[in-house]
Amino acid sequence: MADPGIVMVGIGDCAIARCPVKIKTSGLGSCVGVTIYDRHEKIGGLLHTMLPNIKKAGIKDNPTKFTDAGIEYLVAEIIENGGSRRKLEAKLVGGSSMFENSHMNIGERNIKSAKETLKKLGLEIIAEDTGKNYGRTIIFDTLTGDLLIKTMLRGDKVI
């Protein structure tokens, strides 16, 4: 049975919520999970993005599949729902290199795109857990801004 206090976010999607709701996504491998949070208003969002750049893909729909467009979309949604741009902070998780000989480096490119987009928007990354070679599940708490990171063999941690 699903927990009504937890909103699930699928791959290539995002959600925003207010305290006390939590937002969860699973399966962050080369994908990147980005949380944006206004600590004062207790509103935040989580984005689970697949690919680094919407312009290079030549696709106009579903911006949340793409790191750059997805972050811009998520920030706009949070502001539209009462968040203050000046008070927004970001956390970044994922971007793993899941396969040793991958020439595309999607994880690295997703991380780079996220950092560039957040910098362009003037948002500070206050914590991150990126790269490496393992998957992650994350649960974002809109009450505290904490981000619980769960892994199969490495245990859990909060950033």
Curated annotation (Swiss-Prot):
Keyword Cell membrane included in the entry's annotation: no
Reaction(s) catalysed by this chain's protein: L-glutaminyl-[protein] + H2O = L-glutamyl-[protein] + NH4(+)
SUPFAM superfamilies, alphabetized: CNF1/YfiH-like putative cysteine hydrolases (SSF64438)
Signal peptide residues on this chain, from the entry's feature table: none
An example Gene Ontology molecular-function term: protein-glutamine glutaminase activity
Gene3D superfamilies linked to this entry: 3.30.1330.200
InterPro entries in UniProt: CheD-like_sf (IPR038592), Chemorcpt_Glu_NH3ase_CheD (IPR005659), Cytotoxic_necrot_fac-like_cat (IPR011324)
UniProt keyword list: Chemotaxis, Hydrolase
Biological process according to GO: chemotaxis
EC number: 3.5.1.44
Family from the record: Belongs to the CheD family.
Function: Probably deamidates glutamine residues to glutamate on methyl-accepting chemotaxis receptors (MCPs), playing an important role in chemotaxis.
Stated name of the protein: Probable chemoreceptor glutamine deamidase CheD 1
Gene assigned in the entry: cheD1
